[in-house]
């Protein structure tokens, strides 16, 4: 009996590990990153649209926590923003989460500080990867 429980735990562990380790080379990673950049790094997208996509930004940050280099202070600010956002969304108004409006102040403060740095770092990392891939292709061509 003990052996089968141990085997079961190993199987569960092996099933969880691939999902817990983020593969930044996967197409879903690229799609998610491009989606976020198209929203948060685009000056033509209004704050309302950006605000609606905060859950996707948080999900990306939590799925790939080390992908974008942030200082410890920036990381702490991002974590504080996530906490504040979730706390705000947990408040129910007539049985439903807030539908917008007053959160704009928190969102604007976030965009003015660490959010802008996070998105810029994400964009710069993508640009560096393109340069690296382009140099690799040229090197192979020669």
Swiss-Prot record:
> Which Pfam family name is an example for this entry?
Turandot
Main localisation, per the record? Answer: secreted
Q: Describe what upregulates or represses it.
A: By a variety of stressful conditions including bacterial infection, heat shock and paraquat feeding.
Q: Name one GO biological process term.
A: cellular response to heat
Q: Which InterPro entries match?
A: Turandot
Q: Which residues form the signal peptide?
A: 1-22
Q: Where in the cell is it found?
A: Secreted
Q: Could you tell me the keywords of this UniProt record?
A: Immunity, Innate immunity, Secreted, Signal
Name any GO cellular component annotation.
extracellular space
| Family classification | Belongs to the Turandot family.
Report the protein's function: A humoral factor that may play a role in stress tolerance.
Question: What name is this protein filed under?
Answer: Protein Turandot X
Native species: Drosophila melanogaster
Q: What gene is behind this protein?
A: TotX
